[in-house]
């Protein structure tokens, strides 16, 4: 082999090496996920709280139902991402003010209905008593209904009895609806207060510092 062929072979080898651009991978710095443990703990806690909220509430009192609703709201807060949790917290604080105002108005409305029911019940009892006595005593019956001049008294007594009985039944029905609305509003307040409390918890590893003095719609 002469020098010319050796030189040509060397030059072709160098050209092949220059035609291939070597790939240099970027530097890799292994890092462990910082929030993997706490996220897993929050999911586990969320499932446990949700299990408490989904348990049977048959025969439970209103306070226990409010408690289960609060459990469900806390489980929802633990599942939500941090930005959504902050948004819901701000909206919940504003909604709580309106709900408390509505709750005060409904309580005043129910108090007025109770006063009306008390008055109507007393008038109904009094007019029924007068009507019963007029049936037993003939003199009172003659004075109230059968002597011509006193007929208006009997009509007034029976009219008051019918009117107050009707008002009593209507007020009782409205009062029951208001009572159900109060229970629903208190439960909504409990849910939002629990969500706000869970959203304001400070998480530090395995320890949790909750917001104290949580009230359930009172």
Curated annotation (Swiss-Prot):
InterPro entries, sorted: Orbi_NS3
Coiled coil (UniProt feature): none
Family listed: Belongs to the orbivirus NS3 family.
Function in brief: May play a role in the release of virions from infected cells.
The protein's name in its UniProt record: Non-structural protein NS3
Species per Swiss-Prot/TrEMBL record: African horse sickness virus 2 (AHSV-2)
Gene name of the record: Segment-10
């Amino acid at each position: 082999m002469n020098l010319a062929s050796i030189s040509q072979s060397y030059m072709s080898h160098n050209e092949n090496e220059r035609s291939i651009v070597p790939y240099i991978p970027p530097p890799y710095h292994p890092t462990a996920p910082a929030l993997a443990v706490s996220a897993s703990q929050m999911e586990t806690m969320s499932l446990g709280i949700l299990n408490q909220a989904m348990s049977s509430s048959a025969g439970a009192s209103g306070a226990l139902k409010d408690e289960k609703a609060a459990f469900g709201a806390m489980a929802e807060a633990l599942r939500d991402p941090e930005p959504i949790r902050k948004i819901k917290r701000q909206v919940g604080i504003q909604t709580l003010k309106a709900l408390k105002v509505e709750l005060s108005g409904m309580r005043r409305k129910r108090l007025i209905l109770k006063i009306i029911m008390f008055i109507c019940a007393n008038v109904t009892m009094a007019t029924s008593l007068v009507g019963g006595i007029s049936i037993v005593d003939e003199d009172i019956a003659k004075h109230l209904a059968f002597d011509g001049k006193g007929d208006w008294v009997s009509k007034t007594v029976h009219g008051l009895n019918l009117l107050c009985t009707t008002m009593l039944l209507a007020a009782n029905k409205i009062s029951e609806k208001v009572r159900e609305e109060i229970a629903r509003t208190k439960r909504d307040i409990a849910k939002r207060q629990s969500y706000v409390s869970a959203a304001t918890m400070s998480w530090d590893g395995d320890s949790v510092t909750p917001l104290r003095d949580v009230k359930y719609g009172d």
